[in-house]
Amino acid sequence: MAPISIADIVAALPAEDTWGPATSTDNMLQGVPYAPFSKGDKLGRMADWTSESKDQRTGRQAYNRNFRDQQVYGAGSSNLFSIQAAEDESSFSVVDNTRTSAKRTFGRGGGTVFRGRAQRGAGQRGGRAGFQRVGAGRGQGDRFYDNRGGRSNRGRRFGWKDYDKPQRTREPSVNVRPDWTMLEEVDFSRLLKLNLETPDGEDVDSYGFLYYYDRSYDKAPVKGAERRLQSLDRAAYNVTTSQDPVIQELAEKDAATVFATSDILSMLMCAPRSVYSWDIVIVHQGNKIYFDKREGASLDLVTVNENAIDAPLELAESSAKQESINTPSALAMEATFINHNFALQTVAESQDAKVDMKNANPFYNASEETEPLASKAYKYRRFDLSLERDEEPLNMVVRTEVDALLKNPVNGEDQQLIVKALNEFDSKAQGSGNALDWRSKLWSQRGAVVATEMKNNSLKLARWTTQAVLAKADGMKLGFVSRANPRSAAGHVVLGVVGYKPRDLAAQMNLNLGNGWGIVRTIVDRIRALDAEEDEEKVKKYVLIKDPNRPVLRLYSVPANTFEEDEEAAAEEEEQKAEEDEE
């Protein structure tokens, strides 16, 4: 039998007939084939064999609407090749008797978007300090969003319109110059693992005098008779370490190897709690190390709500003229003014009840100063930072400060106090950190008020507590000062005072002093290791900077004359201003 040819089979098929379903006359429009379609269909290709399929894509592209398959013309209508049902089922429906709940939606005004946070420059005389000007704007893609640490590996939770919030970028407290060399970068997670148990220390010498604390401030104020905060002219000094004449004398006597002041050391010991940028100058001369602060540093200013989630905004970012008194720099100047005057007002200035230290104030010159001295005692204390492996002991001398005395009602002994003040600017304003209204809640819900302050001002309270422990003070007095008018920073009232023991307050705040001493010892060891092979007589200078946008410390090696020109220029400006005032 001859083989069958496929060509013969195809040729034998009827020419007038076509393969596939029979053509319906309903799909003909004036003799032209017509396919029903929907106006909502997208125009596309009949078939595209070159584009990648949805199954070939991975990751987020498989679900991205920009990468969906092109729809074929008429795909939104009924299937042309579907089986027609014998009966019309278009009128058939199923009744759903399940109970549905209304979905709650938020309107346009349901949320507020806050953009950025920064600092603005401002200086002050006497413990001069300031914030650097920072502009607002979006950061780079690899920048942290207002990073507080702790959630870097697990992401972060997003809130209402969080996508529309720009990253909060800040500038460093001091600009890094081209001739600086970065030696090391340490993140806070590594610093938190350090620990060094250090004894309480011993007193080396004491200077100044103290007045007794006025106990009437501990009582709840009578309604309608609030005490106004007074502005008192008293001379108080906050000299940097290397310019302290007492420390210079102790260094010549080899009383210690490392020298610092309590305000500088407390910032270093509480560094993992900081958010804003700060810097410390470290000078290594011979075998002595000095922790200094530069001219115009921000260490002396008291920040407000630095650790709050919704911290105060700069004027350029908040774009509200009436909020100019609630910017970070303005609030810092206001808080510094409040702390200075509150410590002076809460003591009873009486020459009969004045207690002198062993030596007079080392910074006061009666021939030049016209203002009387403030109640202040400077205690120089020595701490042992030695380890078992050290061949020679490593001692550190710290200048600490005490503000007032208090009689112990039991044994009648004098107790040394540190007096500080927390300030409230406006509980309803942006940047308040969801704080309670102090006027109505301070005495009825004091625990909640203090807990909120510990959260919003974690660094500030930790520094004050550390300074009290370094000074071996017997107690702390925390005042609560509020504005007389929330829209004005001119007048303030004292709402109350709460007393704490430094160690108890440190335990409540989960403040680990051993971790702080571990940070100090690590920095000292690093400086000594860098200069091990250098000439001992050569002066080496370093700058330790807190990164403004990340929880990181950076150590830079700088020329020995760094910041000296700035100090000379500042001194010349002061002389010119003094001459103009005299004229």
Swiss-Prot record:
The keyword RNA-binding applies. This is Eukaryotic translation initiation factor 3 subunit D. It is found in: Cytoplasm. It comes from Aspergillus oryzae (strain ATCC 42149 / RIB 40). InterPro entries: eIF3d. The keyword S-adenosyl-L-methionine does not apply. Belongs to the eIF-3 subunit D family. mRNA cap-binding component of the eukaryotic translation initiation factor 3 (eIF-3) complex, which is involved in protein synthesis of a specialized repertoire of mRNAs and, together with other initiation factors, stimulates binding of mRNA and methionyl-tRNAi to the 40S ribosome. The eIF-3 complex specifically targets and initiates translation of a subset of mRNAs involved in cell proliferation. In the eIF-3 complex, eif3d specifically recognizes and binds the 7-methylguanosine cap of a subset of mRNAs.
